[in-house]
From Swiss-Prot:
HAMAP family xref list: Ribosomal_bL19 (MF_00402)
GO molecular function: structural constituent of ribosome
Source species of the chain: Salinibacter ruber (strain DSM 13855 / M31)
Entry protein name: Large ribosomal subunit protein bL19
GO CC terms: cytosolic large ribosomal subunit
Length: 118
């Protein structure tokens, strides 16, 4: 009974506009930022290193290099603070967690684009 109630409550918190993407894909996350009384959209574009969790607890780790410094952020996928997630390009990788990219720089950190057939 309690699990049925939990699943009903969790289903109301899920978003239906989350695109299909995996680790290795370059994503652009639009985040709502509130500063005082104003609200603006901040974009964070980078490579998705991992997806973990399920349901309303699902999170993604996105990494980008900004002015020579690697920056990683963890975003809750179904958070109301995340305005939208766009897939910029698909990456061809063979792993679900790309933590090895943290030690690479320059051309070594590139991910080959996945070519999808019809």
């Amino acid at each position: 009974m309690a699990t049925d109630l939990m699943s009903v409550v969790e289903a109301t918190q899920l978003r239906d506009d989350v695109p299909d993407f995996d680790s290795g894909d370059t994503v652009n996350v639009h985040l709502r930022v509130v500063e005082g009384e104003k609200e603006r959209i901040q974009q964070f574009e980078g490579v998705c290193l991992s997806r973990r969790g399920s349901g309303p607890n699902e999170t993604i780790t996105v990494r980008k290099v900004s002015e020579g410094v690697g920056v990683e952020r963890i975003f809750p996928v179904h958070s109301p603070r995340v305005a939208q997630i766009d897939v910029v390009r698909r990456g061809a990788v063979n792993r679900s967690k790309l933590s090895y990219l943290r030690g690479l720089s320059g051309k070594d950190a590139r991910i080959q684009e996945q070519i999808r057939g019809n």
